A protein has these predicted regions:
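Non-catalytic, topology-defining segments of multipass membrane proteins
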Residues: 1-59, 68, 93-150
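Structural signature of the GPCR N-terminal helical module
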Residues: 61-73
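Short active-site segment of divalent metal-dependent hydrolases/proteases
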Residues: 73-74, 117
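Post-HEXXH active-site segment of zinc metalloproteases
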Residues: 78-96, 129-130
Length: 150
């Protein structure tokens, strides 16, 4: 057996010892981020925080709420518990709702992204690739409209 195969098997065995349990912390992340987003909207709507603080905190919280969506797409929340597989789409739909996105569409796109990572023709996220940070930001906004029928 080659050294690379031995190293790969070692890494796989190490990784297996860390997965399979239920993702309680992912549920906590969902509850904290969604509750905080709702509270933040209330505070802003009642003029208790500035728009700048609102934008800053919202950016962080929307970044945070993507994590449960990502874990749900991969089916990681339920772990090895077959009877809890229903938790993945529930968490995914709730997280996606806050991001004004479809869980089903994101699951499709994200798994295609993993299958075809960095393939210019097949990776759905390749559109974001650009030569400078400004172009990346613009493309990140435009990618939201890539599947809108005209």
């Amino acid at each position: 057996m080659s050294t690379n195969t031995v190293n790969l098997n070692f890494c796989l065995n190490q990784a297996k010892s860390h997965y399979g349990g239920f993702g309680y912390l992912t549920i906590v992340t969902l509850l904290f981020s969604s509750g905080s987003i709702i509270l933040l909207q209330y505070l802003f709507a009642t003029d208790q925080i500035s728009i700048w603080l609102h934008v800053l905190l919202s950016a962080y919280l929307f970044y945070m709420i993507y994590s449960p969506l990502h874990e749900a797409v991969h089916g990681n929340i339920s772990g090895k518990h077959q009877s809890l597989k229903w938790v993945n789409p529930v968490v995914g739909v709730i997280s996606a709702m806050f991001l004004l996105y479809s869980y089903t569409e994101h699951k499709w796109d994200h798994l295609l992204h993993h299958k075809y990572t960095n393939d210019p023709k097949l990776d759905p996220d390749y559109f974001v690739k650009a030569d400078n940070p400004f172009s990346v930001i613009v493309r990140c906004v435009l990618i939201l409209f890539k599947n809108v029928p005209y």
